[in-house]
């Protein structure tokens, strides 16, 4: 996990892991990628679904224009190292025009896009409901 996160995340800033369990969502700030990995393993061991932010942030939290404390906002975004895509798959997503019916179709479209734009081969993660591409 550390190699993956190091390859897609910037080398500076505040990082976030998000945990979800029984409908409750919580952000956990981390100062290093090593700390992110440790926190992700800890939360996973306690039955949480664990996600990560694809950018780093300037601060652990900030006060927005409405006086509310916020964490992972565009205003607080610090750095990004990579581009990322979340490609949804499934018959319902395809019927709504919001994704591809099957993974094979999504991979073919992704390959055509990469060739057309001239991007390097990405890291592809099968997310369960589609593809995460970095």
Sequence positions of predicted segments:
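DNA replication initiation on ssDNA origins
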Residues: 1-82, 89-100
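Structural alpha-beta junctions
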Residues: 11-12, 43-48, 109-121
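Histidine-centered divalent-metal-coordination microenvironment in nucleic-acid enzymes
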Residues: 82-85, 112-134
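A short, contiguous, amphipathic alpha-helix enriched in charged residues
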Residues: 94-114
């Amino acid at each position: 996990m550390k190699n993956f996160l190091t390859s897609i995340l910037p080398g500076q800033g505040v990082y976030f892991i998000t945990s979800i369990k029984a409908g409750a969502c919580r952000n956990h700030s981390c100062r290093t990628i090593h700390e992110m990995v440790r926190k992700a393993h800890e939360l996973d061991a306690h039955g949480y679904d664990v996600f990560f932010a694809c950018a780093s942030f300037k601060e652990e939290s900030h006060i927005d224009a409405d006086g509310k404390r916020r964490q992972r906002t565009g205003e607080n975004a610090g750095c990004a190292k990579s581009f990322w895509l979340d490609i949804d798959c499934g018959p319902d997503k395809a019927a709504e025009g919001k994704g591809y019916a099957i993974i094979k179709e999504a991979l073919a479209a992704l390959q055509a896009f990469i060739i057309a734009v001239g991007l390097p081969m990405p890291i592809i993660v099968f997310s369960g409901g589609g593809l995460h591409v970095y």
